[in-house]
Amino acid sequence: MMSTKGITLFLCLLLLALATSVNGGQGTRRSRMTRALHGGRPSARYDAPYCSEEELQACDCSHNPVRDACLCQYDPAGSPACECFCVEPWRR
């Protein structure tokens, strides 16, 4: 028979698992955490929408057979410029 502490721990873990599985584990908690870590801006993965259309279109990775997907992001160190670089397609 489980103790009260064991049941409470089990329920907490179950709720945590359900909360993270609802949206693939990348919900608002992660984005809020990364915003806090990077001075209020979202992390690199979430920065692409903030880059201008011209910057996104100027990025060309067709010359690279492996890293042929373009990722545009803001530098978390605080640079105001949007930087684009080539990555593996699954990292995009």
From Swiss-Prot:
It comes from the Eukaryota. One of its GO terms (molecular function) is ion channel regulator activity. Contains 4 disulfide bonds. GO terms for cellular component: extracellular region. Residues 1-24 form the signal peptide. The cysteine framework is XXII (C-C-C-C-C-C-C-C). This is Conotoxin Cal22f. It comes from Californiconus californicus (California cone).
